[in-house]
Amino acid sequence: MPREIKDIKDFLLKARRKDAKSVEIKKNPENVKFKVRCSRFLYTLVITDKEKAEKLKQSLPPGLQVKEVK
């Protein structure tokens, strides 16, 4: 089931959880979507600023599988 997250800090907390499996990054011309797959929900964060998206990509946990989709 999908859930949308508005706060970057909340998204990072979800990504650091034990049941977080992978992160999908979808880049569009106007925004970047980060989708983290946990056991029950798929959490989505939409960012319109490209620089913030790059910083968030750098701060993802290292053990998490990251998949980029164009």
UniProtKB/Swiss-Prot annotation:
Q: Lineage in the entry?
A: Eukaryota, Metazoa, Ecdysozoa, Arthropoda, Hexapoda
List each coiled-coil range. none
One MF term in GO for this entry?
A: structural constituent of ribosome
Q: Which family does it belong to?
A: Belongs to the eukaryotic ribosomal protein eL38 family.
A GO biological process of this protein is: translation
Q: Which first-to-last residue range defines the signal peptide?
A: none
Q: What is the protein named?
A: Large ribosomal subunit protein eL38
Q: Which organism is it from?
A: Lonomia obliqua (Moth)
Q: Which InterPro entries does the entry mention?
A: Ribosomal_eL38, Ribosomal_eL38_sf
Keywords (alphabetical) are: Ribonucleoprotein, Ribosomal protein
Task: Keyword check for Ribosomal protein, yes or no.
Answer: yes
* Record GO cellular component, one term: cytosolic large ribosomal subunit
